[in-house]
């Protein structure tokens, strides 16, 4: 029998200490990694619930196990809420990750060797959009498009490649592209060659939910997203469709093809996050995310830094560090010493290796969750610039760290 009175700290002090240290780090550091965010206490409560004990292979009302009457309610709540959130007719909330959601979409209508057309990883795409090191680039014949000379998504190239290669599926979406993507244009190109259109909106989903980024669902055959990042939920994935045409194929692609039992505690946490995203205050959050990102990009430009694509129209942007003669790896380390967390990131046509890079990626989702406004964003961007101007000056880093600490103390992640 398990006792509710025994705490993690009592049973496993080493693990509890590591968790406490991470909690402290999240409080004391400003999080600017674009794919990270903070979830609510309600989301964490759901994910830490007894639902983790329940196996539920199958789908609501069609399970292979008994005792699923209550987890059926949980999953149906998640399905109904995410459909309402994005105006979808179909939703599968079981994918354990965005990558598995993407695999399921491919598997539902493609055969090995079929051609897909996706955004180049080197220009801001994602591994799962056909990168050679990913299963999507091994199973399928992947052709890639990129950015034009102005670092804007090259729709003319997309159309030219589509007409030349006749892909069975066109993949849109990105992991490091700051501007808005024209879903209608992608639909037009896909229709010209009879291709399926699949959008991975993992990075932009929270902005879409908040009305601050175009919704791809009406234009696409398939849409996937992660449930974390800007959507501010637990780590996981979702598949959405504008109609039910592919329901049977998608459901069987997830179970039994790619996964076994769904993670019911995570699905419960997804349901909570979807409810939060349906509230009016989430729209204000999404609006502030965009404002903060734009302010930071503008301020960094004023300080002499080069922003890839020149600006941002979302939550994310890339900083090209080549003019400053500093690598992304070195910048990430220096900013980390000042308690500013970013990730090194390749820029278009980057001459450096992926573990070094010539850029950093900055995102505003997590800082906005804490309560940072545009004034704070302006201050923070100048602190970033201060570090990048003198990345090896320990006194400078200590000074910036003190200012970051003051900002963090002003906006505790979870309050007292």
Swiss-Prot record:
- InterPro entries for this protein: PyrdxlP-dep_Trfase, PyrdxlP-dep_Trfase_major, PyrdxlP-dep_Trfase_small, Ser_HO-MeTrfase, Ser_HO-MeTrfase-like, Ser_HO-MeTrfase_PLP_BS, SHMT-like_dom
Q: Which gene encodes it?
A: glyA
The protein here is known as: Serine hydroxymethyltransferase
Does this entry carry the keyword Nuclease?
A: no
Q: Which cofactor does it need?
A: pyridoxal 5'-phosphate
GO cellular component entries: cytosol
Q: What is the lineage of its organism?
A: Bacteria, Pseudomonadati, Pseudomonadota, Betaproteobacteria, Neisseriales
> Which Gene Ontology terms cover its molecular function?
glycine hydroxymethyltransferase activity; pyridoxal phosphate binding
Describe its assembly.
Homodimer.
Where (6S)-5,6,7,8-tetrahydrofolate is bound, by residue?
Answer: 121, 125-127
Q: Which UniProt keywords apply?
A: Amino-acid biosynthesis, Cytoplasm, One-carbon metabolism, Pyridoxal phosphate, Transferase
């Amino acid at each position: 029998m398990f006792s509710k009175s025994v705490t993690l700290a009592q049973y496993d002090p080493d693990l509890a200490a590591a968790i406490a240290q991470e909690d402290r780090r999240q409080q004391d550091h400003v999080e600017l990694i674009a794919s990270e965010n903070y979830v609510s206490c309600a989301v964490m409560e759901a994910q830490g619930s007894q639902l983790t004990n329940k196996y539920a292979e199958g789908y609501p009302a069609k399970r292979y196990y008994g005792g699923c009457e209550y987890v059926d309610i949980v999953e149906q709540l998640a399905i109904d809420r995410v459909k309402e959130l994005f105006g979808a007719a179909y939703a599968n909330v079981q994918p354990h990750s965005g990558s598995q959601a993407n695999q399921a979409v491919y598997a539902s209508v493609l055969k090995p060797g079929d051609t897909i057309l996706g955004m180049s990883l080197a220009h801001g795409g994602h591994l799962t959009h056909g990168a050679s090191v990913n299963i999507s680039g091994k199973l399928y014949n992947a052709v890639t498009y990129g950015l034009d000379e102005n670092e804007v998504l090259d729709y003319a190239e997309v159309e030219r490649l589509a007409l030349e290669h006749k892909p069975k599926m066109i993949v849109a979406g990105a992991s490091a592209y700051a501007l808005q993507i024209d879903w209608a244009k992608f639909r037009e190109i896909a229709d010209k060659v009879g291709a399926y259109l699949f959008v991975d909106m993992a990075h932009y989903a929270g902005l879409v939910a908040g009305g601050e980024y175009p919704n791809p669902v009406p234009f696409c055959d398939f849409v996937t997203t992660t449930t974390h990042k800007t959507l501010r939920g637990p780590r996981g994935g979702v598949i959405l469709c504008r109609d039910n045409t592919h329901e049977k194929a998608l459901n069987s692609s997830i179970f039994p093809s790619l996964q076994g039992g769904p993670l019911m505690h995570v699905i419960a946490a997804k349901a909570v996050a979807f409810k939060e995203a349906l509230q009016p205050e989430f729209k204000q959050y999404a609006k502030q995310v965009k404002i903060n990102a734009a302010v930071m990009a503008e301020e960094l430009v004023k300080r002499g830094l080069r922003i890839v694509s020149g600006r941002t129209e979302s939550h994310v942007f890339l900083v090209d560090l080549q003019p400053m003669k500093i690598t992304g790896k070195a910048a990430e380390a220096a900013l980390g010493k000042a308690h500013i967390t970013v990730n090194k990131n390749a820029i278009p046509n980057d001459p450096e290796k992926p573990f070094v890079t010539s850029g950093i990626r900055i995102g505003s989702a997590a800082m906005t969750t804490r309560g940072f406004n545009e004034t704070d964003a302006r201050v923070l961007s100048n602190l970033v610039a201060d570090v990048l101007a003198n990345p090896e000056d320990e006194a400078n880093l200590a000074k910036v760290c003190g200012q970051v600490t003051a900002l963090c103390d002003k906006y505790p992640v979870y309050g007292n």
